[in-house]
Every structure is written in C-alpha cells, then in structure tokens.
Amino acid sequence: MGYPGKNHKSYQTPKRPFEKTRIEEETRLVIEYGLRNKREVWKAQSHLRKYRKAARELLALMSSATNQTVFEAKKSELISHMQRAGLLGPDADIDNVLALKVPAQLERRLQTLVYRKGLARSPKQARQLVTHGHIAIGGRRVTVPGYLVTRGEETTISYAGKSPFVDASHAERTRITRPTGAGVN
C-alpha cells in the first residue's frame, strides 16, 4: 500500500506525448490561465476525470434499477458537492457532470479568480500575489494558487490584512485595472 505520508502523483500524463492538437490546446490553457506548467492542466483533467467516473457509475446504478433511493441519494450528493465547488449551476444534472471541460475547473482556481475580480493585472501577477501571501479568503491568507475556491468563499477573496496592497494608494494597486470582459461578481 505504501507509506501514507508520502505524496503520490495527483495527475496522469498523456498517453500520446507528441500529439500536436493536444499540445497546442494545453499551451493555450497554460498561457490563458497563467499556469506554471502543463502539469497543472493535467491535474485539472484528473480532477474532472474522477467526477466523470462517479457520474458514469451513477448512470450504471440507475440502469440496473436495483435501488432507486440509493441512486437518488448518491446523485444528489454528487451534484450538491459540485455545486458547492462552483463547477455546476443550480439546475444541473448528471449529463452536466459528464459535459464538464478543463476550463471550468481552471476557472475555480484562486489564481484565476483573483485576476477575474480585478485584484491583479494579469494571471501571472495573480499567481505571484497569491504565492507571496497578499491574498486572503475570509481573512485567512492562502498561498496556494491552485486552491479551488468554493462558491461561498468566492465573495470573500480580498487582499490580506498585513499586505501593502490593502492601502488603496499603493503604487502597484493604482496600476491594476479591471480586465476587459471579466464577469466580476
């Protein structure tokens, strides 16, 4: 089974390492979301793969029609979990889980939400602000750019209390403008 304290790989590498269309798509995502490398894209894919697997198992359980109450309970549990995570809307179904794509997962990252809220000029700067401890969620400093923000936490993203960015007259903060076309809540 292995040593429980040892970290294990949380992603799966592509089966075809030199597929041109996949490489171009991953590169586009890395640039658009300001990711460090393609490994972060692969982690998002693996995360979604787990949700899709659970949805397929639910569909198999539904088709076997053994126990509808168990199916309904597991279905509502999966969908409510994904709604809290912000991956699905309020009127979602299992088909919506199966239709999820990687950008939906990447949009829930703290780094992306900091940029979308207008707290940083670019996704790269958002990543830097997070790793340097200038961003807080609900008053608690978070230094992980890949932190998946839930819907409830989304409104509490702000500059950390001891960060120099709290001051509205900070030189860098005056240069930060809202990104064009960003849906700021």
Swiss-Prot record:
One of its GO terms (molecular function) is structural constituent of ribosome. It comes from the Archaea. CDD domains: S4. Pfam families: S4 (PF01479). Residues 108-170 form the S4 RNA-binding domain. Gene3D superfamilies: RNA-binding S4 domain. One of its GO terms (cellular component) is small ribosomal subunit. Keywords: Ribonucleoprotein, Ribosomal protein, RNA-binding, rRNA-binding. GO terms for biological process: ribosomal small subunit biogenesis; translation. Belongs to the universal ribosomal protein uS4 family. One of the primary rRNA binding proteins, it binds directly to 16S rRNA where it nucleates assembly of the body of the 30S subunit. Part of the 30S ribosomal subunit. Contacts protein S5. The interaction surface between S4 and S5 is involved in control of translational fidelity. This is Small ribosomal subunit protein uS4. It comes from Methanoregula boonei (strain DSM 21154 / JCM 14090 / 6A8). The lineage of its organism: Archaea, Methanobacteriati, Methanobacteriota, Stenosarchaea group, Methanomicrobia.
